[in-house]
A protein has these predicted regions:
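Bacterial N-terminal signal peptides that target proteins for export
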Residues: 2-13
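Hydrophobic helical h-region of N-terminal Sec-dependent signal peptides
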Residues: 14-18
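C-terminal motif of bacterial Sec signal peptides marking the signal peptidase cleavage site
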Residues: 21-24
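All-alpha RGS (Regulator of G-protein Signaling) helical domain and cognate RGS-like helical scaffolds
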Residues: 27-196
């Protein structure tokens, strides 16, 4: 065989193998939903879960950001950073689902839905935030932990309802992730509260 032809065939084969290998490693699965969107199969439970959990997560992010600015306790600051860091991407993910499903991002009737603990210890999110903004030091930390524990318990209740009633696999999977993560965070917060 001609040396030039052999080199050309070898180079072509190497290029083909490298191209196939790169395509296989790219992780671009055409069957996977793109841009964080869930498959379009969903029911009312999935829609309500996403709509209400977005609102619920926004409240947690708001409290966590306040704790990050107000608390002097490194463990509380670290926890607050992790809460905001986990929940903001979940808000974005659920917003993408609702858009994919052709559903409103905001729930039409907040009054008619179980907010799953949105009222923390008898206080609305606005009342909690207004109260917490007046606190500092150990008093702030204690109130933050108390309210965030109640908030997490509400999220777990909402997520468990989604696991039971939802049909969208990605939504029910996120709900299980929320149950697992927030159960662990409640245990962590209870430990921090006991140590105060």
């Amino acid at each position: 065989m001609n040396l030039n032809l052999r080199r050309t065939l070898h180079a072509t084969t190497v290029a083909l193998v490298v191209g196939v290998a790169l395509a296989a490693c790219s992780g671009d699965d055409a069957s996977a939903p793109q841009d964080g969107s869930a498959s379009s199969e969903h029911n009312d439970a999935d829609t309500q879960f996403a709509q209400m959990m977005i609102v619920h997560h926004e409240g947690a992010v708001e409290m966590a950001e306040l704790a990050g600015q107000t608390s002097d306790t490194p463990e509380i600051q670290d926890l607050a950073t992790r809460i905001a860091g986990a929940q903001q991407p979940e808000i974005d993910l659920m917003t993408g689902w609702l858009n994919t499903w052709g559903e409103d991002v905001e729930a039409m009737d907040h009054a008619g839905m179980d907010m799953g603990g949105m009222d923390m210890n008898g206080m609305s999110q606005e009342e909690v935030m207004a109260h917490m903004e007046t606190l500092e030091g150990a008093e702030f930390d204690a109130q933050f932990l108390e309210h965030m524990i109640a908030h997490h318990e509400g999220a777990i209740e909402m997520a468990e309802a989604e696991i039971e009633d939802g049909v969208n696999e990605e939504a029910t999977s996120l709900a299980q992730t929320i149950v697992d993560a927030q159960t662990a965070e409640i245990a962590e917060m209870e430990g921090l509260a006991a140590a105060q």
